[in-house]
């Protein structure tokens, strides 16, 4: 499962700067969720082959109110759910009482923690950073987040235990072959058959109180008492194996504390980190929306993270029973308006409480899974690419027609198609969208985003200036001299 890195420290030590550098953005992917701590920001990060979730926990000032009070609302939850904690300090300001208070709390937790002395640019870092050893958390790592100095080394060291799980210890050629496997027709069919026997990992996500608990209990059966999030299990989602009509599933449950008999009496816990990790680990995401509230900003935030992760998607509009036709029409209109950009996803109107429409979800879930994991041969992808050209020629670029040569698979979940050709980098976005839609229709891809990557046929001489040999240079000079002599005589 994708690791979570929490950035902890007092205000103005550079946590936001490091967050922005790691996520390559100035805005968190998922931020300011209603009902959640305003000071926590979440984002996906990619660095040196590592993929992880990074959390900016906000500043802790260690005031007289007590470190526990300050951390409980914002940073404590992030620390408990994180796999790695980066404790940032300010090398220029030196060791402070707030740093000592935070360190005392971190020592009481069984967490992998790294002390980072930030802002070491332009100072004698070795002499200044020595005092941070007094925090009692081991080695002190130097960094200048604003300039990027030491950031990559820090992440590589902190996440080294996860390298094998992420496939970073494999040979580069082996990894490239797996990512861009060129299947024959027979190999694609055999691989697809193998995938049919694997359980579908289904993450059920949604903002609090939209009915995730009720839906999960409906899926698992009325008689099943579900009590999760017992002490010690707060960090990870619960994985529940089940089977329906011969097809195996693994439900990834993020709903929080609940008991079937008291489902209406328990306020559902909501953990952003738990939800984001579940999305990353799933094959298919089932987003549950409350019909009575419509599409909220929090729904769009979860939807955005799902799309960025490239996961197959099914949307369930819950609590559809008991509302009049006028409200239903308004909700459908709002869905069309706000979710038009994900026209590939199936939308179901259900009642988890009464079971209405729940059975139809499985068909869309299996369809989305099959589309997201389907192996397609190189010959098939190339044929579809050629058909798209026959129906609609690529445009001219500088008087020359863009030429598409062949296509092959570049990855799955989401499906990635790599198209090779000449001048493909100059294709307009409109033609790229046309090709994406053409592949989707031709391959019957439903319920999952699809990515097309264009790879240029590199010209080895492009951008190079021919350098004359010494003999060629002498002949060139003689020729120029001869031309100049003729011009002089002609005058």
UniProtKB/Swiss-Prot annotation:
Keywords: GTP-binding, Nucleotide-binding, Repeat, Ribosome biogenesis
Record domain KH-like: where: 374-458
Thylakoid in keyword set: no
GO process annotations (BP): ribosome biogenesis
Binding of GTP 1, residues: 9-16, 56-60, 118-121
Pfam families recorded: KH_dom-like, MMR_HSR1
Matching Gene3D superfamilies: 3.30.300.20, P-loop containing nucleotide triphosphate hydrolases
Renumbered residue ranges of the record's region Disordered: 472-491
Binding site for GTP 2: 206-213, 253-257, 318-321
Listed GO MF terms: GTP binding; ribosome binding
Quaternary structure note: Associates with the 50S ribosomal subunit.
NCBIfam families: GTPase_EngA (TIGR03594), small_GTP (TIGR00231)
Function of the molecule: GTPase that plays an essential role in the late steps of ribosome biogenesis.
Family assignment from sequence similarity: Belongs to the TRAFAC class TrmE-Era-EngA-EngB-Septin-like GTPase superfamily. EngA (Der) GTPase family.
Name of the protein in question: GTPase Der
Recorded name of the encoding gene: der
């Amino acid at each position: 499962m994708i690791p979570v890195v929490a950035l902890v420290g007092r205000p103005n030590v550079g946590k936001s700067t490091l967050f922005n550098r790691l996520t390559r953005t100035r805005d968190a992917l998922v931020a300011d969720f209603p009902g959640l701590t305003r000071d926590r920001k979440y984002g996906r990060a990619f660095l040196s082959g590592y993929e992880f979730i990074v959390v900016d926990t906000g500043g802790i000032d260690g005031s007289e109110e007590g470190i526990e009070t300050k951390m409980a609302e914002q940073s404590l939850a992030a620390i408990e759910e994180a796999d790695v904690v980066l404790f940032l300090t300010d090398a220029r300001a030196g060791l402070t009482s707030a740093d000592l208070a935070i360190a005392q709390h971190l020592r009481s937790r069984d967490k992998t923690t790294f002390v980072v002395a930030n802002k070491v640019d332009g100072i004698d870092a070795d002499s200044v950073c020595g005092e941070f050893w007094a925090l009692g958390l081991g080695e002190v790592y130097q960094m200048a987040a604003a300039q990027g100095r030491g950031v990559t080394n820090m992440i590589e060291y902190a996440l080294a235990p996860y390298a094998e799980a992420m496939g970073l210890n494999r040979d580069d050629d082996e990894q490239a072959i797996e990512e861009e496997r060129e299947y024959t027709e027979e190999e694609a069919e055999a691989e697809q058959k193998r995938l049919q026997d694997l359980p579908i990992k289904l993450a059920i996500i949604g903002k609090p109180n939209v009915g995730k608990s009720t839906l999960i209990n409906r899926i698992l059966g009325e008689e099943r008492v579900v009590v999760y999030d017992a002490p010690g299990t707060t960090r990870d989602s619960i994985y529940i194996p089940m089977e329906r009509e011969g097809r195996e599933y693994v439900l990834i449950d993020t709903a929080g504390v609940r008991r079937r008999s008291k489902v209406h009496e328990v306020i559902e816990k909501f953990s952003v980190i738990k939800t984001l990790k579940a999305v990353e680990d799933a094959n298919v995401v089932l987003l549950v929306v409350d019909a009575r509230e419509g599409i909220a900003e929090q729904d769009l935030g979860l939807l955005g993270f799902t799309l960025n992760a490239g996961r197959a998607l099914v949307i369930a509009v819950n609590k559809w029973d008991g509302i009049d036709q006028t409200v239903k029409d308004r909700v459908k209109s709002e869905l069309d308006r706000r979710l038009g950009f994900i026209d590939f996803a199936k939308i179901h109107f259900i009642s988890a409480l009464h079971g209405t429409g729940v059975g139809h979800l499985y068909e869309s879930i299996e369809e989305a899974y099959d589309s997201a994991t389907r192996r397609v041969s190189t010959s098939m992808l190339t044929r579809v690419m050629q058909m798209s050209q026959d129906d609609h020629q690529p445009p001219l670029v500088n008087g020359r027609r863009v030429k598409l040569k062949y296509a092959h698979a570049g990855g799955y979940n989401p499906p990635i198609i790599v198209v090779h050709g000449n001048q493909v980098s100059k294709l307009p976005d409109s033609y790229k969208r046309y090709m994406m839609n053409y592949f989707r229709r031709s391959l019957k891809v439903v319920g999952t985003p699809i990515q097309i990557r264009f790879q240029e046929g590199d010209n080895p001489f492009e951008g190079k200036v021919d350098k004359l040999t010494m003999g060629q240079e002498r002949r060139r000079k003689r020729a120029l001299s001869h031309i100049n002599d003729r011009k002089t005589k002609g005058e």
